[in-house]
Amino acid sequence: LRRQRQMCIRDSGNTTRNADDHCCGQTYIDLYNICPSDPNMIRNIKASIDMVVNTPQVNDWWWIDAVQMAMPIFAKFGKMTGEQKYYDKMWDMYYYTRSQHDETGMFNQKDGLWWRDQDFNPPYKEPNGEDCYWSRGNGWVYAALVRVLDEIPSDEKHRQDYVNDFLTMSKALKKCQREDGFWNVSLHDPTNFGGKETSGTALFVYGMAWGVRNGLLDRKEYLPILLKAWNAMVKDAVHPNGFLGYVQGTGKEPKDGQPVTYKSVPDFEDYGVGCFLLAGTEVYKLK
């Protein structure tokens, strides 16, 4: 949390629009909900998000990692305050990233997966000629949809839009799971640095387990998929001393942070462990 807080205040304080800086706000909101006697805990993040809400700009989430870092905060403030403006702004920003950024948007509805940013939109191709769908990047969006759906009311006007995207992604992810239970860093090109990768796999397990538990995904269809992935991570990625292997380091595409191995130490491992723990929290809740 200290590291996230340093990131949150490193640039422009309450005036930042950067999702990197907003991310820690999710944790502060959760802490505030546990101990609401200290409003200072959310003062800064609320001021920053209110600034974003009260401006017409919607193009801040130009890379898909940002969807996970910032989008759930709007859902949390909408739930906390009961004000529709947070839900409306969240949808406007999500829709721009999804469908309008760089003209086509970042979401390929045909394939059910996301390009990481405009650098990877067509005509960019993987070595095998397929579009480039980075595993962890898609995992970030998948997790963001879960965290948003967990917060917004059942009658929120765009809830079904989020559900539809979640279901579309789920079908696409099911098709590209590896035989060993993991997902490759490149979801459509197993030859491009193919191999086990934990962070993306963990995010997919997190989302699928949540979907099964909440009745959005068919239990018979998706439970075997997510359990195969979870058991593979526990068996193959977790070291006896707790170190987590097969975690890709920082980057934005399959080639970054290579090689990814059982013993490789990523340059920033926090999110690998965090994704794994998120997956565990949802698998644990399954009955």
Residue ranges and their predicted role:
Residues 1-9:
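Single conserved hydrophobic/aromatic residue that forms the stacking wall/gate
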Residues 3, 30-47, 78-92, 149-168, ...:
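Structural helix-adjacent loops and short alpha-helical linkers that scaffold large soluble proteins
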Residues 6, 22-34, 66-73, 109-134, ...:
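Carbohydrate-binding/catalytic loop surfaces
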Residues 16-32, 63-79, 134-150, 197-213, ...:
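Well-ordered alpha-helical segments within folded domains of soluble proteins
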Residues 39-74:
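Asp-box/WD-like beta-propeller blade repeats and closely related beta-sheet repeat scaffolds
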Residues 90-188:
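Active-site cradle of extracellular carbohydrate-active enzymes
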Residues 159-200, 211-257:
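Non-catalytic carbohydrate-binding regions of carbohydrate-active enzymes
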